[in-house]
Amino acid sequence: MGCNQSKSANDVRGNKVNNVNSKKKNNKREDINDGEEIAINPGMYVRKKEGKIGESYFKVRKLGSGAYGEVLLCKEKNGHSEKAIKVIKKSQFDKGRYNDDNKNIEKFHEEIYNEISLLKSLDHPNIIKLFDVFEDKKYFYLVTEFYEGGELFEQIINRHKFDECDAANIMKQILSGICYLHKHNIVHRDIKPENILLENKNSLLNIKIVDFGLSSFFSKDYKLRDRLGTAYYIAPEVLKKKYNEKCDVWSCGVIMYILLCGYPPFGGQNDQDIIKKVEKGKYYFDFNDWKNISDEAKELIKLMLTYDYNKRCTAEEALNSRWIKKYANNINKSDQKTLCGALSNMRKFEGSQKLAQAAILFIGSKLTTLEERKELTDIFKKLDKNGDGQLDKKELIEGYNVLRNFKNELGELKNVEEEVDNILKEVDFDKNGYIEYSEFISVCMDKQILFSEERLRRAFNLFDTDKSGKITKEELANVIIRGFYFFTYSLFGLTSVSEKTWNDVLGEADQNKDNMIDFDEFVSMMHKICDNKPF
């Protein structure tokens, strides 16, 4: 379930956990005490919930089961949305991975906490979204988004093989997610079609990487040494217990091979037979099965299935291969209206109010549905040219240029670069120099959808922790700081940010100057951040 690492890798984790949200090299560390700058991110809202899970959700049906427990489809009691809840038995540890029985349960629980900490840090359109965590005497409960489309594995069984366009769109999404993980120093270690879910059965354009139970933080200075994974997809260096993050790239190469011809490159009657073939690393492109497949596809497979992982391509290189660029979807004229609306909403957004930032990010990342996010998610992925799950300045400028080519109605912009700089200043909530997926969704979505009374009330209640109908600076500090420190640190770290800073945050919305924010003031603040700039 978790990451049973060597000592050296565990040492690395201590340095990586606090930096897991630093999105690209040379980014400054996310730190709420850095120059009194409060950085806002969606991981703040994933927390260990108090009370019994049955008070918040009721069971609809069982979705599946595994070695560590089961996955249930549940519905919110106070809402309408469905969630998938992973139920993990605290007593279900893998005894084969530990020698000292007295340490088994403690080690297993540590792995669960590691998985939770890892999941809460991730913000990518092709990676599963974690909402809440519950815990009782017998179980851990991980509340995640529900994807009704089932496993990619089922699609492979039903369709046997895919044409190159469909295969490229699938691989682009998988590689984008893997590229994002690797840039955050995370290796998945169990990429396979069973761990790729579809949002719905009717489309291959929105898939999700799931099951981070074997995932681990990594460092360029240390090699991973645990033999983990699934026979068909495991990399040869993992069998030798000396590997790095490129083991995920090998697994992607195996998946791509299967998508295009319908069978794996390394087959066998049982796991032992398969592993023997993986150890040799020899595979073939049978002429009859591959004669109509492009040379670009075969070349990419060769790069991903390079036996020597030091010479194997990276996930980013695979994502930017000729095959992906040629066969996967790009922005077209049908996307013009959505893209124009997205850029318009970003231009109008005023992001100086920290409480408003936190509230809109909570609504956009935690309360919106897959269907509501669908069009914007597609646009985000198409704007994200390098596929790293973030929009940089260059990609935003290219988005404007695409609209210019379509003779859009966005209006004449004299200085696109200056416009993009302003957008980054306002929309980059976590201050890392890029626009993340949830930041994009939250700011770009139609505010009539985003700001329903129910959603505004739920956002207000998030901060009004004592349910008094007023938000105080103590409640703000509790929610913000508690969001940064999960399972590890004190929930009451008011000294981490100065009293003046909290007063300033409160004062941004406190119209009657009573040092508290009521619901009407909260609603007024939310509308102002989106309406105070002319379009």
Curated annotation (Swiss-Prot):
PTM remark: Myristoylated. Myristoylation and palmitoylation are required for the localization to the parasitophorous vacuole membrane.
Binding site for Ca(2+) 1: 384, 386, 388, 390, 395
Chief place of localization: membrane
Active site feature: 190
GO CC terms: cytoplasm; host cell plasma membrane; motile cilium; plasma membrane; symbiont-containing vacuole membrane
Signal peptide: none
Entry EC no(s): 2.7.11.1
CDD domains found in the cross-reference section: EFh, STKc_CAMK
Lipidation feature positions (S-palmitoyl cysteine): 3
Membrane-protein topology: Lipid-anchor
Location of the region described as Disordered in the Swiss-Prot/TrEMBL record: 1-34
Subcellular location: Membrane; Cell membrane; Parasitophorous vacuole membrane; Cytoplasm
Sequence positions that bind Ca(2+) 4: 510, 512, 514, 516, 521
J domain: region residues: 345-363
Keywords: ATP-binding, Calcium, Cell membrane, Cell projection, Cilium, Cytoplasm, Flagellum, Host cell membrane, Host membrane, Kinase, Lipoprotein, Membrane, Metal-binding, Myristate, Nucleotide-binding, Palmitate, Phosphoprotein, Repeat, Serine/threonine-protein kinase, Transferase
Modified residues (Phosphothreonine): 230
Binding site for ATP: 63-71, 86
Phosphoserine PTM positions: 65, 117, 216, 219, 334
Residues where lipid is bound covalently (N-myristoyl glycine): 2
Record remark on domains: The junction domain (J domain) is composed of 2 motifs that maintain the kinase inactive. The N-terminal autoinhibitory motif acts as a pseudosubstrate inhibiting the catalytic domain while the C-terminal motif binds the EF-hand domains.
Assembly and oligomerization: Monomer.
UniProt record similarity statement: Belongs to the protein kinase superfamily. Ser/Thr protein kinase family. CDPK subfamily.
Function per UniProt: Calcium-dependent protein kinase which acts as a sensor and effector of intracellular Ca(2+) levels probably in part downstream of cGMP-activated PKG kinase. During the liver stage, involved in sporozoite motility and thus in sporozoite invasion of host hepatocytes, probably together with CDPK4 and CDPK5. In the mosquito midgut and during the last stage of male gamete exflagellation, may play a role in the rupture of the host erythrocyte membrane.
Name listed for the protein in its UniProt record: Calcium-dependent protein kinase 1
Originating species: Plasmodium yoelii yoelii
The encoding gene: CDPK1
